[in-house]
């Protein structure tokens, strides 16, 4: 199972990565591969090379592009098979997130437990 994380804030990205790696260690039967990106365009380039992830954790507000736009691209490349989880400081994007068939969204700051529950 492939998980891609994209957040332009490196401290947030590192925090999510550590939580997801902890989840991967507990669920070794899933054979999780985690890839992290601070640039959403790098993430899209990787998806073009290796295919869409099973799960994408996307910050909504990033320089130059919204996470919702990235989600649209991922959904079009994965035929809607990618689970999308948005991360945002504002709940204003919740309606748009669910219109894109997001699986969930986490309001920052989120707890480790909330992210782990979402991954389950």
Protein language model regions, located:
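CheY-like receiver
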Residues: 44-45, 50-120
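Conserved sequence signature across two-component system core domains
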Residues: 6-7, 37, 56
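Residues immediately flanking
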Residues: 8, 40, 60
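Non-catalytic signal-transmission and effector/linker regions of two-component phosphorelay proteins
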Residues: 1-4
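Acidic di-acidic motifs
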Residues: 7-9, 89
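Two-component/phosphorelay signaling modules centered on CheY-like receiver
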Residues: 10-35
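Conserved Asp/Asn-Gly motif in the active-site loop of CheY-like receiver
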Residues: 34-42
């Amino acid at each position: 199972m492939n998980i891609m994380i994209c957040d332009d804030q490196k401290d947030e990205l590192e925090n999510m990565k550590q939580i997801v790696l902890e989840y991967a260690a507990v669920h070794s039967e899933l054979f999780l591969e985690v890839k992290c990106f601070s640039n959403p365009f790098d993430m899209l380039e990787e998806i073009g090379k290796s295919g869409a992830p099973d799960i994408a954790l996307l910050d909504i507000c990033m320089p130059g592009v919204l996470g919702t736009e990235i989600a649209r691209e991922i959904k079009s490349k994965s035929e809607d098979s990618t689970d999308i989880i948005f991360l945002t400081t504002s709940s204003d994007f919740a309606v748009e997130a669910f219109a894109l068939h997001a699986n969930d969204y986490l309001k920052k700051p989120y707890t480790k437990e909330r992210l782990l529950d979402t991954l389950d």
